[in-house]
């Protein structure tokens, strides 16, 4: 709405794959690609925002991306992520995690300190409680002008494209409670913008992530397994 607003230039890089039968995930990828086309070709926006979707994402490609990344967005709904290792690799390379307290994000925050990450969203007990009482995404959408504007924009579409299936999913079922966490996600993004402007503070956070990433080394993992699971003696 205001391309002249004070905004630190950002490039969002999406790299992932969807299972062949996961229709909604395919629609999300389509939406990201079309948004990228729109944003990257808009002269009023493209100097401050870029969107890139990388096809055929793999370990070899990630080896080029991770050393260059400054922020690692790990935004799964609390209680749904099976603790991957990608966020650990980003941490080792100095990226600051912007994410929920889910999966290995919990261990990263414990190791480096929550003050050195950008944490947002519900905790697992809050998610479970909301499921029990009944989750209604529209209750979060109706009171949020930004969420409404974003969904309406996707529904209107552009260049003959619209994303009704995506927005209908968010308005009706929203199984990953995106709308419940959306406002706090924006708060974390605002914190990111403020912190990034302070280069010394940002460098300090980045270095603390690197310095505390040793806990995720393979040597430590193997030692723990040998001691706690296999009961194998240490051989020097």
Model-predicted regions and their roles:
Residues 1-63, 77, 231, 236:
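Long, K/E/R/D-enriched contiguous segments that form extended
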Residues 67-69, 75-206, 210-215, 220, ...:
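Catalytic binding pocket for nucleotide-activated donors in carbohydrate/polymer assembly enzymes
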């Amino acid at each position: 709405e205001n391309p002249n607003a004070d905004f630190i230039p950002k490039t969002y890089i999406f790299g992932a794959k969807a299972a062949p039968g996961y229709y909604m995930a395919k629609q999300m990828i389509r939406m990201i690609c079309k948004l990228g086309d729109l944003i990257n070709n808009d002269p009023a926006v493209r100097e401050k925002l870029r969107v890139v979707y990388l096809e055929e994402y793999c370990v070899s490609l990630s080896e080029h991306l991770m050393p260059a990344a400054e922020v690692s967005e790990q935004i799964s709904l609390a209680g749904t992520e099976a603790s991957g290792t990608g966020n650990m690799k980003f941490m080792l390379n100095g990226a600051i995690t912007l994410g929920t307290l889910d999966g290995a994000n919990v261990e990263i925050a414990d190791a480096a300190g929550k003050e050195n990450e950008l944490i947002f969203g519900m905790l697992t007990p809050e998610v479970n409680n909301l499921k029990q009482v009944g989750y209604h995404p529209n209750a979060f959408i109706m009171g949020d002008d930004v969420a409404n504007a974003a969904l309406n924009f996707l529904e209107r579409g552009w260049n003959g494209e619209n994303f009704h299936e995506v927005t209908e999913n968010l308005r009706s079922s929203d199984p990953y409670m995106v709308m419940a966490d959306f406002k706090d996600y924006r708060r974390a993004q605002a914190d990111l913008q403020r912190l990034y402007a302070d280069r010394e503070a940002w460098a300090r956070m980045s270095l603390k992530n690197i310095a505390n990433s040793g806990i995720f080394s393979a040597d430590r993992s193997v030692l723990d397994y040998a001691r706690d699971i296999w009961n194998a003696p240490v051989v020097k």
